[in-house]
């Protein structure tokens, strides 16, 4: 069975209601408090809060009650090597994206609720309660920011005139040509006059927020390695419904699965051929190949 | 002569919200033909709007404060424009012009005043997110015209420690040569687990907005070179009012002028103890790989 547009829209509205009435207020009221009570996840900068876990639990309870046959994948319950994205309808959820922002009170944390089917994102809702920005979309039904349809203004898409989202990431080990070194070298390539010489980079500290800003045309592209399916699923749907595309972060990867962990998001507001040329002009500046 | 700083702050707030803000918001993203700054690289974008807004600001402040000096980004002449002890408005009509051109919602107006070369009034207004941050010397800080309880905020933030901090960084528009290399090498050291191991870096593309966010307690510090007095003057005053501090970007530059062109801005701490700030600054400087130098 493939879900109809009407069902997708219903799921979208369920996400919106859940975020507006329950999750948003929780995230907003707790951001930037109790700094010392967080436990570290993979290393010193990958942070998990008790609230993150609690919120995921609330989301899971609500969604499985309403859609008991759908599968659920969340950041906090993910088990490496065990959790898999199948063809069935699957909720892919990040209770708090931008956890570091959340802990510091920097107003760019959000909740990201996505639904995938046949391994593709088909519903996405991203809510930043601090700035009251709610992005939402479902396949075939358009993309919206606070219930205003997202219409990306038409203009050329040129790498040398672009504003790109880049992040520091949580991998920090120098040397031996690891991902950290490749990322730093890629940033140099993109920024330098002898490289792409882009207009600038921005870092909001949240993959979902970055993708939504690309979707709305505020940014031209977002390049990142290391994020997970839950970081990108919702934003990916919003991006595509707004006319953008998602390709791989490594050279030549035009079609990637949701959990590829290495992404290049490119905005709409231009021809599809321009998007392809943008990717082709971007990829040579990627220093080496990111591996996850 | 005694200057009523609170009154000037109020005047600048109204100028920002009533006159400048609406222009920035309505014109953001509409500039298709960029006006390239003379002698600058293509990524340093000046729009006609920027110049018009500065003229509007200049006319408004001149009428109200005819004896005060004025320094603006658009009227600055290298080698000629100097900051004296006289009361001097230091103005960036649109900070974050690249954001402005791209309609990324973090362009703002930054209005500052120095007396005896010290920032004593600061007003920063981002009309896209309706955020007005202001302060005047001795009068604390206000967010959207309400006194901001920064002490509670600092309490919730905990200790100021480099490897628990979120740092704002900006590559700037100069993308070759020693300064660019120093910036990239320093970013790498700050992030690396062998050196700074900071929680992360952020960049929203506006120095003034960044300093406002530090004052609000959202970010811990901001390290940059290449910006001018008008980029930092307002933010500097606001930051000082909440216990923050501005030093140079290069090691050992504890005392700098507003036009130093390299800066490390650091947030306040709960007891406003200088030891914690001093240690943070020293640890940060240990990650600076090279030396930033601007004419």
UniProtKB/Swiss-Prot annotation, chain A:
Pathway in which this enzyme or protein is active: Polyol metabolism; myo-inositol biosynthesis; myo-inositol from D-glucose 6-phosphate: step 2/2
InterPro entries noted in UniProt: IMPase (IPR033942), Inositol_monoP_metal-BS (IPR020583), Inositol_monophosphatase-like (IPR000760), Inositol_monophosphatase_CS (IPR020550)
Stored Pfam families: Inositol_P (PF00459)
Annotated catalysed reactions: a myo-inositol phosphate + H2O = myo-inositol + phosphate
Cofactor requirements of the protein: Mg(2+)
SUPFAM superfamilies in UniProt: Carbohydrate phosphatase
Record keywords: Hydrolase, Lithium, Magnesium, Metal-binding
Binding residue positions for substrate: 75, 96-99, 231
UniProt activity-regulation remark: Inhibited by Li(+) and Na(+).
Residues engaged in binding Mg(2+) 2: 94, 97, 231
UniProt entry tagged with the keyword Hydrolase: yes
Molecular function GO labels: inositol monophosphate 1-phosphatase activity; metal ion binding
Residue sites binding Mg(2+) 1 per the record: 75, 94, 96
Family matches, as PROSITE patterns: IMP_1, IMP_2
GO biological-process terms attached to the record: inositol biosynthetic process; inositol metabolic process; inositol phosphate catabolic process; phosphatidylinositol phosphate biosynthetic process; signal transduction
EC number: 3.1.3.25
Job description of the protein: Responsible for the provision of inositol required for synthesis of phosphatidylinositol and polyphosphoinositides and involved in the inositol cycle of calcium signaling.
Family: Belongs to the inositol monophosphatase superfamily.
Protein name (Swiss-Prot/TrEMBL): Inositol monophosphatase 2
Record organism: Saccharomyces cerevisiae (strain ATCC 204508 / S288c) (Baker's yeast)
Gene behind this protein: INM2
Curated annotation (Swiss-Prot), chain B:
Source organism, top-level taxon: Eukaryota
Catalyzed chemical reaction(s): a myo-inositol phosphate + H2O = myo-inositol + phosphate
Residues annotated for Mg(2+) 1 binding in this entry: 73, 92, 94
Annotated Mg(2+) 2 binding sites: 92, 95, 231
Keywords: Cytoplasm, Hydrolase, Lithium, Magnesium, Metal-binding, Nucleus
A biological process term (GO) from this entry: inositol biosynthetic process
Alphabetical list of InterPro entries matching this protein: IMPase, Inositol_monoP_metal-BS, Inositol_monophosphatase-like, Inositol_monophosphatase_CS
Cofactor: Mg(2+)
CDD domains reported in the protein's UniProt record: IMPase
One cellular component (GO) term of this entry: cytoplasm
Family: Belongs to the inositol monophosphatase superfamily.
Further remark: Present with 2440 molecules/cell in log phase SD medium.
Name of the protein in question: Inositol monophosphatase 1
Originating organism: Saccharomyces cerevisiae (strain ATCC 204508 / S288c) (Baker's yeast)
């Amino acid at each position: 069975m493939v879900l109809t547009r009407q069902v997708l829209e219903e799921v979208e509205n369920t996400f919106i209601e859940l975020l507006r009435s329950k999750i948003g207020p929780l995230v907003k009221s707790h951001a930037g408090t109790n700094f010392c009570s967080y436990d570290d996840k993979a290393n010193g900068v990958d942070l998990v809060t008790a609230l993150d876990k609690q919120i995921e639990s609330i989301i899971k309870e609500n969604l499985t009650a309403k859609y008991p046959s759908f599968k659920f994948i969340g950041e906090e319950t993910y088990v490496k090597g065990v959790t898999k994205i199948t063809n069935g309808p699957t909720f892919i959820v990040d209770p708090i994206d931008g956890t570091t922002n959340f802990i510091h009170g920097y107003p760019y944390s959000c909740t990201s609720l996505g639904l995938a089917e046949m391994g593709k994102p088909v519903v996405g809702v991203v809510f930043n309660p601090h700035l009251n920005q709610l992005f939402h979309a479902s396949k075939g039904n358009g993309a919206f920011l606070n219930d205003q349809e997202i219409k990306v203004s038409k203009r050329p898409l040129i790498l040398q005139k672009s504003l790109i989202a880049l992040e520091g990431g949580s991998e920090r080990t120098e040397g031996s040509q690891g991902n950290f070194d490749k990322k730093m070298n890629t940033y140099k390539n993109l920024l330098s006059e002898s490289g792409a010489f882009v207009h600038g980079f921005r870092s909001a500290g949240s993959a979902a927020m970055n993708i939504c800003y690309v979707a709305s045309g505020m940014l031209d592209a977002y390049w990142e390695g290391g994020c997970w399916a839950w970081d990108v699923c919702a934003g990916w749907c919003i991006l595509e419904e707004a006319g953008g595309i998602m390709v791989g972060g490594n050279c030549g990867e035009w079609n990637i699965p949701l959990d590829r962990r290495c992404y290049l998001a490119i905005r709409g507001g231009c021809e599809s051929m321009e998007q392809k040329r943008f990717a082709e002009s971007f990829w040579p500046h990627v220093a080496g190949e990111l591996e996850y | 002569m005694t200057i009523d700083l609170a009154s000037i702050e109020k005047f600048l707030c109204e100028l920002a919200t009533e006159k400048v803000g609406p222009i920035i918001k309505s014109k953001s993203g509409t500039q298709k033909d960029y006006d390239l700054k003379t002698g600058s690289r293509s990524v340093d974008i000046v729009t006609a709007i920027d110049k018009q807004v500065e003229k509007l600001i200049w006319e408004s402040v001149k009428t109200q404060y005819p004896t005060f000096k004025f320094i603006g980004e658009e009227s600055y002449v290298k080698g000629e424009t100097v900051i004296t002890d006289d009361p001097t408005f230091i103005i960036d009509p649109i900070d974050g012009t690249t954001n402005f051109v791209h309609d990324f919602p973090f362009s703002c107006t930054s209005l500052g005043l120095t007396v005896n070369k010290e920032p004593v009034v600061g007003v920063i207004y981002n009309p896209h997110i309706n955020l007005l941050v202001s302060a005047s010397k001795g009068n604390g800080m206000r967010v959207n015209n309400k006194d901001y309880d920064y002490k509670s905020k600092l309490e919730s933030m905990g200790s100021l420690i480099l490897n628990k901090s979120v740092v704002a960084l900006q590559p700037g528009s100069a993308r070759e040569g020693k300064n660019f290399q120093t910036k990239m090498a320093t970013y790498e050291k700050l992030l690396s687990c062998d050196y700074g191991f900071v929680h992360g870096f952020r960049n929203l593309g506006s120095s003034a907005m960044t300093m406002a966010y530090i004052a609000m307690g959202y970010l811990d510090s901001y390290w940059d070179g290449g910006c001018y007095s008008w980029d930092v003057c307002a933010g500097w005053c606001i930051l000082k009012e909440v216990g923050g501090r501005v030093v140079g970007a290069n090691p050992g530059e504890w005392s700098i002028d507003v036009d130093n062109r390299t800066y490390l801005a650091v947030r306040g701490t709960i007891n406003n103890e200088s030891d914690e700030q001093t240690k943070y600054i020293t640890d940060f400087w240990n990650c600076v790989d090279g030396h930033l130098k601007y004419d």
